[in-house]
Curated annotation (Swiss-Prot):
It holds the Pfam family Toxin_3. Excitatory insect beta-toxins induce a spastic paralysis. They bind voltage-independently at site-4 of sodium channels (Nav) and shift the voltage of activation toward more negative potentials thereby affecting sodium channel activation and promoting spontaneous and repetitive firing. This toxin is active only on insects. Residues 1-18 form the signal peptide. This is Beta-insect excitatory toxin 1. GO terms for biological process: defense response. PROSITE patterns: LCN_CSAB.
Length: 88
């Protein structure tokens, strides 16, 4: 019974504090273009306050963005490709 109560309390909190992945956009609604992953990691972590980032399909893809950050709307196929690409 205690486990069920704990589950019911923790589950909504996890959704609130969850983070998202995607192409973070600036005030003009454009994602930064790139050729190098190092540039994207700096762009994502220092400008958009994400956990990390890399260059995926010529745009900076960020991991661990806050829920209030705007991201570029992309297809599910492209999102799953960038989510599963291995980062060194």
């Amino acid at each position: 019974m205690k486990f069920l109560l704990l589950f019911l309390v923790v589950l909504p909190i996890m959704g609130v504090f969850g983070k998202k992945n995607g192409y973070a956009v600036d005030s003009s609604g454009k994602a930064p273009e790139c050729l190098l992953s190092n540039y994207c990691n700096n762009e994502c972590t220092k400008v958009h306050y994400a956990d990390k980032g890399y260059c995926c399909l010529l745009s900076c893809y960020c991991f661990g963005l806050n829920d209030d950050k705007k991201v570029l709307e992309i297809s599910d196929t492209r999102k799953s490709y960038c989510d599963t690409t291995i980062i060194n």
